[in-house]
Regions:
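A non-transmembrane, solvent-exposed segment enriched in polar/low-complexity residues
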Residues: 18-165
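Conserved redox-active cysteine motifs that mediate thiol-disulfide chemistry
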Residues: 251-255, 259-279
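Alpha-helical repeat scaffolds
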Residues: 195-204, 231-239
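Structural microenvironment flanking redox-active thiols in thiol-disulfide oxidoreductases
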Residues: 269-312
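Short solvent-exposed coil/turn linkers within tandem alpha-helical repeat scaffolds
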Residues: 173, 177, 190, 206-214
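Amphipathic alpha-helical coiled-coil segments
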Residues: 157-176, 194-198
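N-terminal "domain-start" segment that seeds a small globular fold
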Residues: 214-248
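Bacterial Sec-dependent N-terminal signal peptides
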Residues: 1-29
Length: 313
């Protein structure tokens, strides 16, 4: 019996030793607050997958697991908003999370994570300065100090230019990295076609071949169909009386497609100017097609009537 137990123990140890599956190990500490659990979460489209979960004991935790390849994820502390970006690989990481001052948190462990930390650093710096400018702008607005407001607006624009220049420098130094493609993919809807193509062309071939790189390429292909100089693709929507109306069926020398909604304050505020433009130029061949984002048909119809929008809807 003793020999059998000994044999089983030897087998168990041997099997354990033979387990060569690559794993990631994230050893972390939490300061500036308390927490019960920490999660490693991955965003997949509109869903969020839990890759790992670990309890927090005496301010420490350890997340372990295995990934098939480089995986962007977030370390999220239970009960806290947001999370810390980590590019998970089967390697060892350290994560020092500061709940009181999240910008002081830091994750280290791989070359890829080191590149990501460069982006995080300039983002945190920009965020701090933007917050200060915003607070000053609110004060100037309350005091109706238009000169100060203009000055602060110029400072903000310069801050954004400086941030983009720093980001471009990191991109240039790491053009072929997964992180460079990932950062750009997160800004798909901030750039028009020309700007996105310009940014994409700074990436290396390996970066372009990553999943975020492919996402950017797909976006560029879609934007190319509506780029300046291209024939706008046709689409068909129902009019207020329920009849289908295609964009190409509207004939005019110049066509304006106006996206709006009854609940959109800036849209409604601009409508009087659009009405004036239509009344002035419609006799010369201007046509307008307003595309509403309303889900409430009654609110849509009422806004059309109230704002005296007499063109195509």
């Amino acid at each position: 019996m003793k020999k059998s137990l000994l044999s089983l123990a030897v087998i168990a140890v041997s099997l354990s030793a033979c387990d060569t599956t690559p794993k990631y190990n994230i050893n972390g500490t939490i300061t500036g607050g308390e927490a019960n659990n920490v999660y490693l979460l991955q965003r997949q489209g509109r869903t969020i997958d839990t890759l790992a979960k670990a309890p927090v004991a005496e301010g420490k935790f350890k997340l372990t697991g295995s990934v098939a390849g480089l995986t962007p994820a977030f370390i999220v502390v239970e009960g806290q908003r947001g999370g810390d970006l980590i590019f998970v690989e089967n390697a060892d990481f350290t994560a020092n999370l500061n709940l009181e001052n999240p910008t002081a948190s830091k994750i280290e462990g791989t070359a890829t994570q080191g590149i990501a930390n460069q982006y995080t650093a300039i983002s945190n710096e920009m965020g701090k300065m933007a917050k200060e400018l915003n607070q000053s702008y609110r004060t100037a607005y309350q005091e109706k100090d238009e000169a100060k407001m203009k000055e602060l607006q110029e400072q903000y624009e310069n801050l954004m230019k400086d941030y983009e220049a720093k980001e471009d420098a990191i991109n240039k130094a790491n053009a072929d990295s997964y992180v460079a493609a990932y950062i750009l993919a997160g800004k798909l809807y901030e750039y028009d076609y020309e700007k996105l193509v310009e940014k994409f062309n700074t990436l290396g071939e390996n970066a372009k071949a990553t999943e975020p790189g492919k996402t950017i390429a797909d976006r560029i292909q879609k934007l190319s169909a509506v780029a300046v100089g291209q024939v706008a693709p046709d689409f068909t929507l129902n009019t207020p009386d329920g009849k289908p109306l295609s964009m190409h069926s509207i004939k005019g020398k110049v066509k304006v497609i106006d996206f709006w909604a009854s609940w959109c304050g800036p849209c409604r505020g601009e409508n009087p100017n659009v009405v004036k433009m239509y009344e002035k130029f419609h006799p010369k061949g201007l046509e307008i097609l307003s595309v509403s984002l309303d889900e409430d048909k009654d609110a849509w119809l009422k806004a059309i009537e109230d704002d005296k929008l007499t063109w195509n809807h």
